[in-house]
Swiss-Prot record:
Pfam families given in the database record: Ribosomal_L2 (PF00181), Ribosomal_L2_C (PF03947)
PANTHER family, sorted: LARGE RIBOSOMAL SUBUNIT PROTEIN UL2M (PTHR13691:SF5), RIBOSOMAL PROTEIN L2 (PTHR13691)
Biological source species: Nitratidesulfovibrio vulgaris (strain DSM 19637 / Miyazaki F)
Protein's GO biological process: cytoplasmic translation
PROSITE patterns listed in its UniProt record: RIBOSOMAL_L2
Function: One of the primary rRNA binding proteins. Required for association of the 30S and 50S subunits to form the 70S ribosome, for tRNA binding and peptide bond formation. It has been suggested to have peptidyltransferase activity; this is somewhat controversial. Makes several contacts with the 16S rRNA in the 70S ribosome.
InterPro entries in the record: NA-bd_OB-fold (IPR012340), Rib_uL2_dom2 (IPR014722), Ribosomal_uL2 (IPR002171), Ribosomal_uL2_bac/org-type (IPR005880), Ribosomal_uL2_C (IPR022669), Ribosomal_uL2_CS (IPR022671), Ribosomal_uL2_dom3 (IPR014726), Ribosomal_uL2_RNA-bd_dom (IPR022666)
Record lineage: Bacteria, Pseudomonadati, Thermodesulfobacteriota, Desulfovibrionia, Desulfovibrionales
Compositional bias of kind Basic residues: 259-276
Family classification: Belongs to the universal ribosomal protein uL2 family.
Name of the molecule in the record: Large ribosomal subunit protein uL2
Quaternary structure and partners: Part of the 50S ribosomal subunit. Forms a bridge to the 30S subunit in the 70S ribosome.
Length: 276
């Protein structure tokens, strides 16, 4: 995948870059693996805003992705590499030997016609999935389970990966994209390789409207609000807010540690991110 720079025919296109989609082989999804997607606009089941600055955006069809990789011992052929509007990574359509079709995250380097497999007997090559107990130390992984059978939860965005750095008893030690080293049960499954579409981080949206197409709304600064709306709001003319940065609910932000010290998974973190 390469990044294509647009000609500066307008201010919005001057710094805009787009993917060339060279790895994508089909534009329409597999109908049996799609379902309708209702926009939530950042609201929960009570209709209250739980995620600010969300709303609008282009209509989408949800692609059902196999994060569990629980079809064991059956070889599959990569039929197509497709674009998915619901995530930054590309997805691969698999045709299994028994006739079933499934979508998976497309790893870096996978192409149309390749064979992939899941299970303890699978080869160590991109796209194959197996428990981490069977994976050699030093291997690059993605779509990593946190609990056995729950499905991959770590390293699913474009270009991300974790590295298996050691094994200790029933645990595998992973170096996460953030630099954190943490223990995960070695019985958990992971997929070999790095997530594809690695140049996604180099895309420049170029204009505000392109953010709106993605369903992202403007972010208003606290100091620009009224005092009823934010602790930093109000004042005559332009003001600095008069206190350390806080959220609209008064919780310190911009560097303030908010992680629960008593969180159960803290004991599984060997090295915090940012530590030497």
């Amino acid at each position: 995948m390469a990044v294509r720079k647009l000609k500066p025919t307008s201010p919005g296109r001057r710094f805009q870059t787009v993917s060339d989609f060279e790895e994508v082989t089909r534009s329409t999804p597999e109908k049996s693996l799609t379902e309708g997607l209702t926009k939530k606009s950042g609201r929960n089941n009570n209709g209250r805003v739980t995620m600010r600055r969300r709303g609008g955006g282009h209509k989408r069809l949800y692609r059902i992705i196999d994060f569990r990789r629980n079809k064991l011992g059956i070889a599959a052929t990569v039929a197509h590499i497709e674009y998915d509007p619901n995530r930054t990574a590309r997805i691969a359509l698999l045709h299994y030997a028994d006739g079933e079709k499934r979508y998976i995250l497309a790893p870096l380097g996978i192409k149309q016609g390749d064979m992939v497999q899941a299970g303890e007997g699978a080869d160590i090559k991109p796209g194959n999935a197996m428990p981490m107990a069977r994976i050699p130390v030093g291997t690059v992984l993605h779509n990593i389970e946190l609990y056995p059978g729950r499905g991959g939860q770590f390293c699913r965005a474009a270009g991300t990966y974790a590295q298996l750095v050691a094994k200790e008893g029933k645990y595998a030690l992973l170096r996460m994209p953030s630099g954190e080293v943490r223990k995960v049960l070695a019985a958990c499954c992971a997929t070999i390789g790095q997530v594809g579409n690695v140049n996604h981080e180099n895309i420049s949206l170029g204009k505000a409207g392109r953010n709106r197409w993605l369903g992202r709304r403007p972010k208003v600064r606290g100091v620009a609000m009224n005092p009823i709306d934010h602790p930093l709001g109000g004042g005559e003319g332009r003001s600095s807010g008069g206190r350390h940065p806080v959220t609209p609910w008064g919780v310190p932000t911009k560097g303030y540690k908010t992680r629960d010290r008593k969180k159960a998974s803290t004991k599984l973190i060997v090295k915090r991110r940012g530590q030497k």
